[in-house]
Each structure stands twice: as C-alpha cells, then as structure tokens.
C-alpha cells in the first residue's frame, strides 16, 4: 500500500455522491463502490495511524483488498441513485477482483398473448412489448418452448402468426390442427372457449402432462414410436417446471424469492419465481467473491444485476432471508425502473417464510452438487497451475482463419460447464495479417463488455505476442480478464498444427508451461482450442464459398479477374461494390462493365 498516494487522495475527496475505484500498484482494478459522500465512505476503509492501514472493522475480503490498494480514482455524480446505476454498470463491464460477481444469465422467456386480438395466439418473448393489453406468463427458466408446442398440438389454435392475414385455410386445417378462423369456419366465441382451455392447461401443468400422456399412449398404440418418444422427452421437460408448482399461496401473489447458501469459498444464489400464487420456475447461479462473501452486498448486487426495465412481468414483492441496510435505496431504484413500488420483504413466519426456507434449501443442495462436479477440482487445479486470481468457470477462446489474405474471419467460442453455443460469435475481419486480425477481433469483443460481461479467462491461439496484444486491449478498458495462450511447439522454426507432429505449450504472461499429453488440464484447453479452430475454419469456408460464387457470377457477366482485383482494391469488399452507383463503378471499369455489375445479383 503506497500511503503517500492514498493519503493525498483521501485528503482531497469531495463530500459528494459518486463512484470510487481501487487499483493495485500495477494499475489493476481491485474494487468498485458507490457512496452518498465519497469523503466519508472512502475514508471509512482506513485507520489513520502514523502509517495508513486498513480499518479493523472491515470484512476479511475488503481488508485484503485495501492492503493491496495503491491508489484511488473516483467519479462525481448528481446523486446517490446515479451512483448506484453507475456502480452496477461498471462492475458488470470491468469485473473488479474483489467485487461480488454474478454470472450474466440470459433473459428468461415469457409466454404471452394479446387480449386485443379476436383470435389470439400464444407466443414467446424475452422483453416487454410496447402495446397495451398483453398478458404474460412466466418467467420460464426451462420448458417454455415445450409448453407452447404441447398446447398447439393438443388444441386447434391459430398455428402461425400470418395465418389470419392469408384469409384462406391452410395445411393445418386439413390435418385438423386449426379450425380456420381465416375463412370464418369458427366463431369468435367458440374459439374463445378453446383458448380459455389452453390457458387453463398452461397454468395447470399436471393436467397438461396427463393430456400429453394420453396422446403419447395413442401414438405408441399406432406404432408411431418416434413421435411417442419425442412426446415423452417433452413431458420430462415440463415435469421440471412442475417440480415446484405444488407450492401454493392462498392469495394469487407475484413474488420473487432470493436466497444465498455459502460453504467455504463457494456460494450459490437461488431465485424462485412465483406468479399468481404458484412457483412457476427457479434458477441458480454460483457467486464469485475473493476471500469470503458479504451477504448484504451479495443481495444488493443480485437485485441490481437481475432487475431491469425490460422485464415483462416484474414481481409485486421480493422476499429475502435478511433485512438489507440498503433497502430504501434499492426500493427507490426498483420504483424508478417499473413505475411502482416493489417492496423488499424479510418474512419471519408463515407461508412466505416457508418460501425463503425452500429457496435456501435448494441453494444448499445445488451448492453441494456444485462441489461434487468433476470439473470443479479440474478448474481449481488449472487455476493453481496458471496462477489465476479466480476460478476459470467461463472461458472465451479466439482464433482467426484466412487463405492468403482472403475471406479473413475470426471466431470466439465460450466454455462454461460445456460449450455454450448460443454465446459463440463470428467476426468478418478487415486486417491482412494475423496480429491485426486478432487485435480487431479482441477489440470488438472488449467493446461489447457492457452488453456481454467479460469472462474469467481468455484463451488465445499463439504465444507471448498475442498475450501482450490482448493485455493492451484489456488494460485500456480497465477491465479484469486473465489471459493465456496455447500453441504447438516449433520444429525447424515452424509450428505444426497436425496432430502428433508437435506438443502443445501453454503460455501465461510470465512463464511457459509444458504438460504431458495425458494431463487433464491440458486436454481441457486443447478441447476448447480445437473447437474454436473448427468454428473459425467453418466460417472461413462459408465466406470463401460465398466470395467464389460472387467472382464466378461477375466473370460470367464479362468482368475478368484483373478488373475484379481493381474493383476490390478500390471498394474494399463485394458489399461495397454491390452498393456502388453507376458513376462510382465507372471510375474503375468501363460503362458496359458497370452496367453488367449493376445487373448482376451477387
């Protein structure tokens, strides 16, 4: 701790609301916090002895953070609410070492229908819709698609969004899956009765499962075993939603229940979603915190992290197993988001206390199962081997691909308890060499940290040069992402990708690590590297094929390769050539060739 630097800052702190950042001696971000008064809050971390020292009142985690702190930076804002918003945004983007971090869960789907429609349909959305008269059901952490498919299979609802516009009965009418309201073959009143039945099944999963089982048995009797098997799998997924639906409140309340279980260094947050008196779904996520968990801060972070104005069906109340000191400011924040009060309630008895107990029980069980996962010891061993500050639960790997500078592309894959294919990203790159391509790709990924939070670890295909390049990008943003690389050892000054030709070498910012081929840690990183290489190659081939087709088409139109090269050099891409005007094309080719290009569909 550099006392002079810190002391100078502490003596000049303003008595205003703001957000403060602690950094270590290497300018690495340690912690982000907010304050009603920067002067009072930041000073509370210290005791002013002859040498500046951490306050004895601090938790072990924050005490350790202060002992590593070298300097402080701060941002002044208008009020405490603005400080709260900015703090939450910066923690999501920068992932400071000592803040409590939550995984970015995807937005959960809701099932909805529009009450204004004469013949309504059930559909899925992940965000609030702009018009009035929309009724939502959910959120569903699993099984939303299966619920919808089941209802459309069991009942003759309007199957597709565009059906009514067609004004003509389609195939669904012929196979008895729709009653053709488009041709007025069913009245609005009769359709309303069928739709009411669908809503009843949507809200009573036991009854829905019973109907699906009857259909499954009929399919099996008719030797339609494949369809019966698909229905069986769908029933199993709906049963997972059903797991909590036996819990019922006498009043039809909309509640969210949050609970955190902690064991040693590991913590688990569980959320139960109750709508109209029934628990409709649940989700859990591990929490990351260096040197122990502060429960007050953890619940505050969870509320700020998971509740935003795009939520279609916010709860009427949030239940917590403790009374939060920051309750008033959080309730004011929620009221600002949703335009109504959402109380944070700590029930001490009754049915709501039972819901808290249930959430805690689930958090404890999931934490136990998390500790038993085979991958956790492997990740802990990898953390120790690579000298990482946190467990590498979420790993992003990058690779580029091109053929002599053509169809330059990049790819990113994500590994978190397996490959997360919905998080994969592809990049069309403009750089002509591997370093500029990697810089462009990593820069674009880093710029998206505000929308998609940073991972624990970046895995690059290369060596120290690639690591330093990535470090520049991360440090320029002040984010916390650890970086390693993997590459084939060089034989005759060449790196051989072919399997068996050379061993893989791991590289951290400070050392080179060689492991036996049988080492599970190496095999995990190789598996991730091979997946991103496959993903990049596949995208490159698609782009190359597209480009070859464009070249072939233009050659058919009489544009020779020499002219094509001049066009690409001048415009930069086929997209730019396609969008160019006749006058712009004539700067490079003849008028006849310009007309041929404008007529070509490439």
UniProtKB/Swiss-Prot annotation:
Keyword terms of this UniProt record: Cytoplasm, DNA damage, DNA excision, DNA repair, Excision nuclease, SOS response
TM ranges: none
One of the GO biological process terms: nucleotide-excision repair
Residue stretches making up the GIY-YIG domain: 15-100
GO CC terms of this entry: cytoplasm; excinuclease repair complex
UniProt domain UVR: residue ranges: 206-241
Subcellular location(s) of the protein: Cytoplasm
Disulphide bridges, residue numbers: none
GO MF terms held by the record: DNA binding; excinuclease ABC activity
Quaternary context: Interacts with UvrB in an incision complex.
Task performed by this protein: The UvrABC repair system catalyzes the recognition and processing of DNA lesions. UvrC both incises the 5' and 3' sides of the lesion. The N-terminal half is responsible for the 3' incision and the C-terminal half is responsible for the 5' incision.
Family (UniProt): Belongs to the UvrC family.
Protein name: UvrABC system protein C
Organism this protein belongs to: Wolinella succinogenes (strain ATCC 29543 / DSM 1740 / CCUG 13145 / JCM 31913 / LMG 7466 / NCTC 11488 / FDC 602W)
Gene: uvrC
């Amino acid at each position: 701790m550099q006392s002079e630097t810190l002391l100078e800052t502490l003596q000049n702190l303003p008595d205003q609301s703001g957000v403060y950042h602690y950094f270590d001696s290497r300018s690495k971000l340690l912690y982000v916090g907010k304050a009603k008064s920067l002067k009072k809050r930041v000073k509370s971390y210290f005791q002013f002895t002859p040498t500046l020292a951490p306050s004895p009142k601090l938790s072990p985690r924050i005490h350790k953070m202060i002992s590593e702190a070298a300097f402080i930076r701060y941002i002044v804002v208008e009020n405490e609410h603005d400080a709260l918003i900015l703090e939450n945004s910066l923690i999501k983007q920068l992932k400071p070492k000592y803040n409590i971090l939550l995984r970015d869960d995807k937005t959960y789907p809701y099932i909805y229908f529009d009450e204004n429609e004469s013949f309504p349909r059930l559909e899925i959305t992940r965000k609030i819709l702009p018009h009035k008269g929309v009724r939502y059901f959910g959120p569903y952490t699993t099984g939303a698609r299966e619920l919808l498919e089941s209802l459309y299979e069991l009942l003759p609802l309007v199957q597709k969004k565009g059906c009514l516009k067609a004004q003509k009965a389609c195939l669904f009418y012929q196979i008895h899956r729709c009653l053709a309201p488009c041709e007025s073959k069913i009245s609005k009143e009769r359709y309303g009765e069928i739709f009411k039945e669908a809503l009843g099944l949507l809200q009573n999963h036991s009854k829905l499962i019973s109907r699906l089982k009857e259909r499954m048995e009929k399919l099996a009797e008719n030797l339609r075993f494949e369809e019966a098997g698909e229905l069986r799998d769908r029933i199993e997924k709906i049963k997972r939603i059903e797991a909590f639906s036996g819990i019922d409140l006498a009043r039809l309340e909309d509640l969210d229940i949050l609970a955190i279980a902690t064991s040693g260094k590991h913590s688990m947050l569980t959320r139960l979603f109750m709508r109209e008196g029934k628990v409709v779904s649940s989700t859990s996520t591990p929490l990351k915190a260096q040197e122990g968990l502060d429960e007050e801060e953890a619940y505050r972070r969870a509320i700020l992290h998971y509740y935003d104005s795009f939520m279609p069906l916010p709860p009427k109340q949030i239940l917590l197993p403790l009374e939060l000191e920051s309750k008033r400011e959080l309730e004011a924040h929620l009221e600002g988001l949703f335009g109504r009060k959402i109380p944070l309630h700590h029930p001490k008895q009754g049915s709501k206390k039972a819901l808290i107990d249930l959430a805690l029980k689930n958090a404890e069980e999931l934490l136990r199962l998390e500790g038993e996962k085979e991958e956790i010891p492997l990740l802990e061993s990898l953390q120790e081997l690579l000298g990482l500050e946190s467990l590498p639960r979420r790993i992003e790997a990058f690779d580029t691909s091109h053929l002599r500078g053509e169809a330059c592309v990049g790819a990113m894959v994500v590994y978190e308890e397996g490959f997360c294919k919905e998080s994969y990203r592809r990049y069309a790159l403009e750089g002509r060499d591997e370093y500029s391509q990697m810089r462009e790709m990593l820069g674009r990924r880093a710029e998206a940290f505000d929308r998609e939070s940073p991972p624990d670890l970046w895995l690059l295909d290369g060596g120290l040069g690639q690591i330093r390049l990535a470090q520049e990008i991360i440090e320029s943003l002040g984010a916390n992402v650890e970086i390693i690389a993997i590459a084939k050892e060089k034989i005759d000054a060449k790196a051989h990708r072919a399997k068996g030709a050379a061993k893989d070498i791991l590289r951290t910012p400070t050392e080179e690590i060689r492991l036996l081929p049988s080492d599970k840690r190496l095999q995990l990183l190789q598996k991730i590297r091979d997946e991103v290489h496959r993903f990049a190659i596949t995208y490159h081939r698609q782009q190359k094929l597209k480009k070859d087709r464009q070249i072939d088409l233009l050659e058919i139109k009489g544009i020779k390769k020499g002219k094509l090269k001049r066009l690409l050099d001048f415009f930069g891409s086929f997209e730019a050539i396609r969008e160019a005007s006749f006058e712009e094309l004539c700067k490079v080719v003849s008028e006849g060739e310009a007309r041929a290009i404008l007529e070509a569909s490439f």
